[in-house]
Structures are given as structure tokens and as C-alpha cells.
Design a protein with these regions (language model features):
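Catalytic glycan-binding domains that act on GlcNAc-containing polysaccharides
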Residues: 42-197
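Sec-dependent N-terminal signal peptides
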Residues: 1-22
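N-terminal propeptides/low-complexity segments immediately following signal peptides
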Residues: 20-44
């Protein structure tokens, strides 16, 4: 008898709990307290501002590539977007990548150099077989991605010494100095305009 009474009590308790769950689902979610509303994720104004600044910088670079280097508008937009993306991904200054591209290929995607160096950043496939396997180095995004990854690896190997990394990338101290001079020319184009500009 006790068992039967216990079973009935347990069953009715479960039925009541189930009914409350169904009722709660019908009424929708519970109202949130002020404390729980504070934890709601809203895109930060800073993130939006950073995104706008990146878009503005990409546009500035694109315009400069068209005007100074004669790159077609659509191609300039593609190159500048790829540079900004790779710069962000590999924590490299966009001006550095642009300086390398200007020296290596003068922004000519199909450029060919010594030892099979190919594309905008003159990546040498034989020296980086694993990295560039099955990649079309004459395609802007792929070339900038590969060249930036290579440069990033050199910077890491040199423990952050960009000059030493450039020497590894280009093969000489003179190359590193030449790139450094070009970086100074590209830096104003890769910095977001301020309100007073």
C-alpha cells in the first residue's frame, strides 16, 4: 500500500512539473532581469569604427594603386583588400606588404623573376613547396597570402626583427633597406584619415 501511495505521489508530482514546463513554453521566455540584460552581446562601437577605418584605408590604398601604379580599379580594390586582410592575419604593417609588392613586381600579378619567382610578392615555389602546393601564384589573393605567410615566418624566426626577416625574404641587407625606404612612402596611405584631414 505504501508503495502504491508513494508511486501515485511521485507520478502526480512529475505530471505537475511537466504541466508547468508546457505552460512556460506557451507563455514564451521569462522576462530578463536588468542584471541579465547587461550580459547581452551588442557589437561594440569600437569594432564598428575599426571596420569603417579598415574600409576607408582599403579605399585609400586602392585609389593610390590606380593613380600611382596604373592598376585597374577593380584589380586595385582586390589587391588592397588582400593586403589589408593578410596584414591583419599575420600582424604585419600593410605599408610593409605594399612596399615589398612595389619592389618585387610593381603590382603586376603575372610578374616572373629569377628562380621561378612568381606574382605580386615574387614567391619562389621551389623554396616553399609545402606552402604553395596547388596554389596559383599569379592570383592576387593567393600570392599575397603566401608571401605574407612566408614573411611572417621569417619575422618569427628573427624574433621580431623585421630587418632580418626582410634580408631573408629578399636575400640581402640592401633589399631590406630598399623596402624600409618604400615603407615610409606607403605609410601615409595605410593609416586611417583623422577627422581633421
Amino acid at each position: 500500500m505504501r508503495r502504491l501511495l508513494c508511486l501515485l505521489t511521485l507520478t502526480s508530482g512529475l505530471a505537475l512539473a511537466n504541466a508547468q514546463d508546457v505552460l512556460a513554453q506557451d507563455q514564451g521566455p521569462e522576462p530578463q532581469s536588468a542584471a541579465s540584460v547587461e550580459n547581452v552581446s551588442i557589437p561594440a562601437t569600437q569594432d564598428i569604427a575599426a571596420s569603417d577605418a579598415t574600409a576607408q584605408t582599403t579605399h585609400q590604398v586602392s585609389r593610390m594603386l590606380s593613380q600611382k601604379f596604373g592598376v585597374a580599379k577593380a584589380k586595385a580594390e582586390q589587391i588592397s583588400a588582400a593586403v589589408m586582410s593578410a596584414a591583419s592575419k599575420y600582424s604585419l604593417p600593410p605599408a610593409l606588404l605594399l612596399a615589398i609588392i612595389s619592389i618585387e613586381s610593381r603590382f603586376k600579378e603575372k610578374a616572373r623573376g629569377l628562380n621561378g619567382a612568381t606574382g605580386l610578392m615574387q614567391v619562389v615555389p621551389a623554396a616553399h613547396r609545402k606552402l604553395v602546393r596547388n596554389i596559383d601564384l599569379t592570383e592576387a589573393e593567393a600570392n599575397i597570402e603566401a608571401g605574407s605567410a612566408i614573411l611572417h615566418g621569417y619575422v618569427q624566426s628573427a624574433r621580431g626583427d623585421v630587418g632580418a626577416a626582410l634580408k631573408s625574404y629578399g636575400g640581402s641587407t640592401a633589399y631590406a633597406e630598399k623596402v624600409s625606404l618604400q615603407v615610409q612612402k606607403f605609410t601615409p596611405q595605410t593609416e586611417p584619415a583623422t577627422a581633421g584631414d
